[in-house]
Amino acid sequence: MCNTNMSVSTGGAVSTSQIPASEQETLVRPKPLLLKLLKSVGAQKDTYTMKEVIFYLGQYIMTKRLYDEKQQHIVYCSNDLLGDLFGVPSFSVKEHRKIYTMIYRNLVVVNQHEPSDSGTSVSENSCHREGGSDQKDPVQELQEEKPSSSDLISRPSTSSRRRTISETEEHADDLPGERQRKRHKSDSISLSFDESLALCVIREICCERSSSSESTGTPSNPDLDAGVSEHSGDWLDQDSVSDQFSVEFEVESLDSEDYSLSEEGQELSDEDDEVYRVTVYQAGESDTDSFEEDPEISLADYWKCTSCNEMNPPLPPHCNRCWALRENWLPEDKGKIPEKATPENSTQVEEGFDVPDCKKAAASDSRESCAEEIDDKITQASHSQESEDYSQPSTSNSIIYSSQEDVKEFEREETQDKEEIVESSFPLNAIEPCVICQGRPKNGCIVHGKTGHLMACFTCAKKLKKRNKPCPVCRQPIQMIVLTYFP
């Protein structure tokens, strides 16, 4: 008899290497329910080998088409005799241990010394050999042979995949040299659920004939000597020809070496890896200004349109719904601003005219008069300081400090007045007013980097810079404020 081996797979399939050789060659008698299932697909005996049980079980699944059309490794047997036999509504062909256990529960070991069973087995084996070629010729095909158990033990990290052509030994009385040569070849019977896809294939591989069987001259049939296939679930663990690929991997550790395809002679190198560097830039500005995400603008800053009662953001002068101009967006009386901005001695300047061109005196005259008054005050303070140095030496220092502070305050007020005069000298019809104070023209350019925004007056822009506020338009930090002159 031929020794059959079921290799140990990574998925945990049952290995016949752990089962005694006598048990592998033992005939089994299916239980009544399993026997009924086997006879429905052509079985005619009462005792079978494990190979024959798997063969007829595959024929039953193929005939009834119990497998899923899309995921064909799944077998549905809830409303079938197979479901009553296994006790499960469905199972996967990749669960080798589970399938072997379900089959083995429905078998009874038969003593080989019984003459009736052995004679029946021999007669049925001969009949099976005669009809074996007709039964398997339509479905024979090239398939990949998985490594034997000895190969898996010696090389657990690699899987050799070879293609073998099914062949049958026609002459039992070959020469010893030919038999020695043929015993290294494997005979495979391929029966698939779907012949077009070659899915769920039943493979029965005849193992090497032992030297003891050759010495004793035990007759062997190559079609029936292959007891149980390499894996107990290999008859259900085959994918379609297009889906045949290995999914072998190992858990990587510090001591593990680089993975290489030794069978194909290909090695993975660093050149095969492609590294892409992606840089993400955040947009600084957009075409449309949004005030909804601005934390400094609250609902109290929104203005209500008098025409349609729509609440609008503070900066746009027009209503977003009806496009009406905001009420009091521009001052009604345009002559009030220059009157407020002119100094006290502006009445005297307006009354005087130049003789040649009959024009009003320029603002430079007022500046000169202010400068003369400052000089007079400074000289008076110096004279009073000298006189008091002799009379009251104890209070001279306080007088000096007070006079200097008065001069500094006066100069500060004068510069502010000059800035207001310059700002108010622009015609309001030429430019829009400041969006912050709504009174002075937009002449304070907020500069940040190489760009700037002209949206406020010089005074309001300086206040923003002094308080370390960002630009109201683009939210960038303010670097400087530039006073802008218009022609």
Swiss-Prot record:
Region called Interaction with PYHIN1 and necessary for interaction with RFFL and RNF34, residue ranges: 150-230
Region feature (Interaction with MTBP): 170-306
Renumbered residue ranges of the record's region Region II: 242-331
Spans annotated as Disordered: 1-21, 114-188, 211-237, 252-275, 369-397
Residue ranges of the motif Nuclear export signal: 190-202
Signal sequence annotation: none
Zinc finger regions, RanBP2-type: 299-328
Gene3D superfamilies the record matches: SWIB/MDM2 domain, Zinc/RING finger domain, C3HC4 (zinc finger), Zn-finger domain of Sec23/24
Subcellular location, record wording: Nucleus, Nucleoplasm; Cytoplasm; Nucleus, Nucleolus; Nucleus
Composition skew (Basic and acidic residues), residue ranges: 126-148, 164-179
PTM comment text: Phosphorylation on Ser-166 by SGK1 activates ubiquitination of p53/TP53. Phosphorylated at multiple sites near the RING domain by ATM upon DNA damage; this promotes its ubiquitination and degradation, preventing p53/TP53 degradation.
Tissue: Isoform Mdm2-alpha is present in lymphoid and testicular tissues.
Spans annotated as ARF-binding: 210-304
Domain of life: Eukaryota
Short sequence motif Nucleolar localization signal: positions: 462-469
Motif (Nuclear localization signal): 179-185
Biased composition (Acidic residues): 252-274
Biological process (GO), any one: regulation of biological quality
Residue positions where Phosphoserine is found in the record: 166, 190, 240, 242, 246, 260, 262, 382, 391, 403, 425
Subunit composition and interactions: Interacts with p53/TP53, TP73/p73, RBL5 and RP11. Binds specifically to RNA. Can interact with RB1, E1A-associated protein EP300 and the E2F1 transcription factor. Forms a ternary complex with p53/TP53 and WWOX. Interacts with CDKN2AIP, RFWD3, USP7, PYHIN1 and RBBP6. Interacts with ARRB1 and ARRB2. Interacts with PSMA3. Found in a trimeric complex with MDM2, MDM4 and USP2. Interacts with USP2 (via N-terminus and C-terminus). Interacts with MDM4. Part of a complex with MDM2, DAXX, RASSF1 and USP7. Part of a complex with DAXX, MDM2 and USP7. Interacts directly with DAXX and USP7.
Family designation: Belongs to the MDM2/MDM4 family.
Domain comment quoted from the record: Region I is sufficient for binding p53 and inhibiting its G1 arrest and apoptosis functions. It also binds p73 and E2F1. Region II contains most of a central acidic region required for interaction with ribosomal protein L5 and a putative C4-type zinc finger. The RING finger domain which coordinates two molecules of zinc interacts specifically with RNA whether or not zinc is present and mediates the heterooligomerization with MDM4. It is also essential for its ubiquitin ligase E3 activity toward p53 and itself. Interacts with IGF1R.
Protein name per UniProt: E3 ubiquitin-protein ligase Mdm2
Source organism: Canis lupus familiaris (Dog)
